[in-house]
């Protein structure tokens, strides 16, 4: 057993030291994936069935006519956030060219020459721009995931332009501007859905910080043996996800894995762990995952995570007092966001919820 663990660490280290990620393996024309990427046999099905989108489909909410249909839209958000934890939004106000340009920028960076990308490769999370493969490469007990990523905190203190690669610099600033606007609206609508004043969640700094996490999922020669992203829930208040048309995102709903089918121009919204906690389970943060890419072209996704600040601080959060009563007492102890975030990343994406540690 000790030898196997040592071998796994050595192989992960050797993979990491190439600084070229999963894209480097594809460029080397491999036909079999390295064993560090292999899931335990049978774990992909996890004894939980897949269901087609004809059986289940996550809610789609149209923001067109929001000024005249606000109450109706708030009701739909309340239902989606409490029963699904996810919904897709269309006519959200972010121009299609902005969505396309950020996807193109992510692709351009990940398809740069290796010597260019290597200059940004780091495992130091304090850097303004962090490029690597699997943030939890050394901490997760699960297999290595079939994807490469880069991350950058865009608010409250935006990076200097020269901190970002030329390939995606302009697109990241423009996209982030639109994400902050949409995030502002979503937190207003969620506050109203909870029966609170519209600025309640914003006043708690729930959207003060914005982290862009941009994934590149190369085609996989053995997609049934590995996974793109392990099942997990998000350590944020709210996440806005832009996915391309390849698909592969699934959420866990009523003991089944349900496909989140791509809709051109739509954005996927999901509730994070922090929002579930402060609402005392009135909204839910659900597990989701990404299957390994079966397509002939790479899958691109851009996740915008909203939290309190650029770096998690020791702000303490607990369930909102207005949402508690004698019949609905607090279900969670207060959390220190910095402590929570450090524990979440130390645990890695291992398929277990970290929020459960804070249940009373």
UniProtKB/Swiss-Prot annotation:
A GO biological-process term? biosynthetic process
Q: Does the keyword Ligase apply?
A: no
Q: SUPFAM superfamilies, alphabetically?
A: Clavaminate synthase-like
Task: Name the cofactor(s).
Answer: Fe(2+)
Q: Known EC number(s)?
A: 1.14.-.-
Q: In which tissues is it expressed?
A: Constitutively expressed in leaves and blades.
Residues the entry annotates as binding Fe cation: 232, 234, 288
| InterPro entries from the UniProt entry | DIOX_N (IPR026992), IPNS-like_FE2OG_OXY (IPR044861), IPNS-like_sf (IPR027443), Oxoglu/Fe-dep_dioxygenase_dom (IPR005123)
Q: How is the cofactor bound?
A: Binds 1 Fe(2+) ion per subunit.
- Locate the residues binding 2-oxoglutarate: 299
Q: Which Pfam families did the record assign?
A: 2OG-FeII_Oxy, DIOX_N
Q: Which keywords has UniProt assigned to this entry?
A: Iron, Metal-binding, Oxidoreductase
Q: Does the keyword Iron apply?
A: yes
Q: Identify the residues that the record assigns to the Fe2OG dioxygenase domain, covering every copy.
A: 208-309
What is any one of the record's Gene Ontology cellular component terms? extracellular region
Report the PANTHER family cross-referenced here: 1-AMINOCYCLOPROPANE-1-CARBOXYLATE OXIDASE HOMOLOG 6, OXIDOREDUCTASE, 2OG-FE II OXYGENASE FAMILY PROTEIN
Q: Which family does it belong to?
A: Belongs to the iron/ascorbate-dependent oxidoreductase family.
Q: Spell out the protein name for this chain.
A: 1-aminocyclopropane-1-carboxylate oxidase homolog 6
Source organism of this protein record: Arabidopsis thaliana
